Amino acid sequence: CDIVREYDTGNYYGWRVATRLGGAATIHIVYLLGIGAMIEALLHGWRRWISVPVLTILLVVLVLSGSRAGIVGVGLFAGMLVLWYAQRRLHTLKARAALVTTVLLAVCAAVVGMSLMRGSLVDRARVLTWRTAWHAATTDVATVLFGVGYGRLWPWLGGMTGALPLRSHAVRTTFFGASLPHAHNTVVAVFGEMGLVGLAALLVIFGVVIVVAVRAVRGPSRVLAMTILASLPGLLVDTYLIKNFPVSLLWWVAVFMLLVLEAE
């Protein structure tokens, strides 16, 4: 319904599907979590007449979002599902190695296909943005440690609220240099604005999440753990968790659900 409303009001960016919950570059996180929930429902035989259509819709809108990170995430999630399903039936090392190779090739094919459609995962605009962030964050010892300050390199909230004229998605000249409206990389965003201290905190947080999720893959919460793991590579090509708060909130809810389930 949200997607239909966006198109009805003309609030969209080119052909890419976006919603008020999140833009085309980040909404794939919500779709990926929903896909995981529907897969879990199918594995438990829960109302397939609902699960199958919803799963199909989520896959379609994810592709229509044009998110390269979303395609990679779904590919990784599907690969992990296939490996989990097959390891229960493949008993030889040779067979498992062949399966792993096949899954990796399929993921690579998905990346290549998306690159042919929309260009490479890393385009010139992102390179310029990351270079600007590097120069800004390495001007002196203080900025290396603490960054230039949250919201200074990329005042995205000002653009969203209309306080600043930052509606365009194109590269613009800023006080620090040429840059997109946001970093298109969560790691770069944290380092550029919060320095090594912020980056260390980010790595600790995600280190804990990865350890818990990897352990959970072997238990009953494996599908939820796989969706969380599959969402992490997108951090390198898009910015979320420190912006796009509705999408980030849903991701953190999923993470805390996994933590609670594992604690029990």
Regions found by a protein language model. Name each.
Residues E193-S231:
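Hydrophobic transmembrane alpha-helices and their immediate junctions
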Residues A78, L224-E264:
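Transmembrane alpha-helices of multi-pass inner-membrane enzymes
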Residues L64-S65, A78, V82-V141, Y150:
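A membrane-periplasm/extracellular boundary helix in multi-pass inner-membrane enzymes
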